[in-house]
Amino acid sequence: MGKTLAEKVWDAHVVRKGEGEGANAQPDLLFIDLHLIHEVTSPQAFEGLRLAGRPLRRVDLTIATEDHNTPTLDIDKPIADLTSRTQIETLRANCKEFGVRLHSLGDKEQGIVHVVGPQLGLTQPGMTVVCGDSHTSTHGAFGALAMGIGTSEVEHVMATQTLSLKPFKTMAINVEGTLRPGVTAKDIILAVIAKIGTGGGQGYVLEYRGSAIRALSMDARMTICNMSIEAGARAGMVAPDQTTYDYMQGRPHAPEGADWDAAVEYWNTLTTDADATFDVEVDLDADTLEPFVTWGTNPGQGVSLSAKVPSPEDFGDENAKAAAERALQYMGLEAGTPMKDIRVDTVFLGSCTNSRIEDLRVAADIIRGRAKDPNVRMLVVPGSARVRLEAEAEGLDKVFKEFGAEWRFAGCSMCLGMNPDQLEPGERCASTSNRNFEGRQGKGGRTHLVSPVVAAATAVRGTLSSPSDLEPAAAGALTGIAV
């Protein structure tokens, strides 16, 4: 019997096989190739090592960055919020004590951990990657088995470079066809989550497959894998191919010379075998997919942008009906309202889902030469200092500034509102982030998850919009990048 991609990577990392079978099976012990850390989930883990008198076992496989609490304005000044400042200072002290490489605020490689890892070439096919962060699944776009872990597991990896886990089930997400202009990777994953639900992937590793996935860039594949957790999955993966290798080659930590050739030879084996069997398969037609947007308070509460706000009566399940009623109340929406009639106050372009260079390029293409709706505030927050510098070298910052957007420094920013970038109560935001939970972007804030394409068009019109809703002269020179 053949193996899936996830099974191949798993089996290659088993240090000790758990005893027993089926429901009585004990966890396997897996070796971890890359451990990424940040300021929020690492302090207790470092303290655990300190109290036990243990060293950090593999400093060479551990890298830290500051992202969740970092300000995106005035980064040369002391952090005003005491909690945020304490977490940043604690990370710096811990990394210095234990010898961990840290990219601090102001460093040219600082940024969101799930942007920094890939851009440095640290994330590679066939790896096991962990981080104390839900959206570690981002790295699965490279054919890595990448998952978020809790603080106690962070300490375990620090101490042993291993993790005890039971094997997951496997689910294939088959996306065939060709995306239409203005439809992106973000729309694919929002449609997948709407289809299987926020718990549909629980206990599974998702493998994204099919012609539509193969046609995507690495930035776009990272967008899809990033939100696997929003479907309840532990991880999401895409098999590596030439697109992967073209992205990786020449990056600081990528193999070189003969090592590169040997690595690619191995990476080419990391595909699901023809005779492998998935536990579940889900199909999505890319040809018919439209821009997607959420209307409620979880990522599964989404519809096509051309649709209307659903009614609780549209849901047969009583729990889903009750959830819809609560979501509509919190979001201040009425059933039957066209999604395109919903006016927003803020547009946020950023987060580990959509803050890479292609995301910024496609948004800039749409707004170039246009005027922002005067009642809309737009924040553009690059995912890393490197992305920011690259965007500035291309003149994208000037496009955003001329449009009236705020051009910020790198960080998680308004995705989760742990720094000053927050919504006011009742404020409505079109956001390229990954979660639209109640209060996620600020107490009482209302979040609609969208693609960078929809975010840009929305900033122009002031209501949830796609580029096709703009006047021909306002559509910009779309690059065709599927982000």
UniProtKB/Swiss-Prot annotation:
One of the GO biological process terms: L-leucine biosynthetic process
Cofactor: [4Fe-4S] cluster
Catalytic activity of the protein: (2R,3S)-3-isopropylmalate = (2S)-2-isopropylmalate
Residues that hold [4Fe-4S] cluster according to the record: C352, C412, C415
UniProt enzyme class: lyase
Cofactor binding notes: Binds 1 [4Fe-4S] cluster per subunit.
Protein EC: 4.2.1.33
This protein's pathway: Amino-acid biosynthesis; L-leucine biosynthesis; L-leucine from 3-methyl-2-oxobutanoate: step 2/4
Protein family membership: Belongs to the aconitase/IPM isomerase family. LeuC type 1 subfamily.
Function noted in UniProt: Catalyzes the isomerization between 2-isopropylmalate and 3-isopropylmalate, via the formation of 2-isopropylmaleate.
Subunit structure: Heterodimer of LeuC and LeuD.
Name of the protein in question: 3-isopropylmalate dehydratase large subunit
